[in-house]
Amino acid sequence: MGAVRTALVDALFAALPVALVYFSGWAYLTSYLGQFGIDATQFDVSFTTVLVYAFVPLQSCMVLGAIAVIVVLGFIGFLIEFHAKEDSKGVRTVAASFGLFAVVLVVVLLFIIKAAATTAARDMSDNVWKGEKSQSVVPLVDPRKDDPSVKLYNACRDGRRLRQVIGLPNQLFLMCRSAVDECNRGTLFAVSSEGKILYSADKVREEINVRKICQP
């Protein structure tokens, strides 16, 4: 029974870091895309892409501090149980208490990561609206000149108002900032890897009436 328990604990500790990193990346990605009304579940996002974005919220001081506390408590619990060679009920109870507290902190850590991801995603979306993110121009393949979305796209391109939201292997999301209210309003374009406009949608920045991100 002890060997089974040890194997389960080892498996948990081995999988936990990967699960937390993946959760961090997915929380950031969904929050960031949600700022533009994009549902991340509607298209394929590779595992490596999620892992890359995971390091944005993981750099938060609150997240790093919580992780450090969990590691220290888990290590202390391990040392207590490791040195309890005899079947000391009191010592094992203390070790179990440390382990339980560490599990509770892991749950709390999920909420901390989510909060950090939301804050980082909002800051990154502000960079798009302020025009501080990279400008991207995707040539359209055989565009219909009379299509209103094509005309708007070309006007945005010529006015250097296109900013990349995110680039994926099969499509690219671009934000055309409004020529009148560039920090708050615009048009979102989804462009395929073949250079075709999949759809376009008018967008208004979230918290437009709460936060001003550009000087008047």
PLM regions with names:
Residues 88-122:
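Internal/C-terminal transmembrane anchor helices
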Residues 133-216:
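Extracytosolic and intramembrane catalytic regions of membrane-associated proteins
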Residues 1-98:
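N-terminal first transmembrane alpha-helix
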Residues 2, 80-82, 89, 111, ...:
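Residue-level marker of intrinsically disordered, low-complexity segments enriched
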Residues 66-83, 126-131, 154-170:
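Alpha-helical membrane-embedding segments
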Residues 115-136:
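Alpha-helical transmembrane signal-anchor/signal-peptide segments
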Residues 51-54, 98-112, 131-151:
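Cytosolic juxtamembrane regulatory segments of multi-pass membrane proteins
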